[in-house]
């Protein structure tokens, strides 16, 4: 099945809304001094409904959008989100059919892993300020924020993808 224009426009609308919320609202509501990464959580949740190449594509496009406002090297977030989307889509067949609790825990675990991956990529390219922070605390805050975010965003993702698995290029 190919992704129709309706699904594409719905997905773009959701990502644009989450992006605007991320840059305008979320920085004012920090958990333990850290900002929650809503676009990452949405990439992981959406990738549960895609095959691995398409999950990587969605992650890349969302990451490029986020890279426009971050003070990290351009493409670092896109790379991290691409890998998160690919990895999430790879385990999607075991998780998509499960209940919301299992899905929330999976999104929390994968989001925390992607946060650690972001710090690892930063260390590889020599960004000390990314790895100096308390990585465990940042990953924990991301995981904790992913639990209610998944419950709130799941109906929107189901609205975008009425079928269980959608493949953009078949």
Regions from the language model: what does each represent?
Residues 1-170:
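Terminal, non-globular segments
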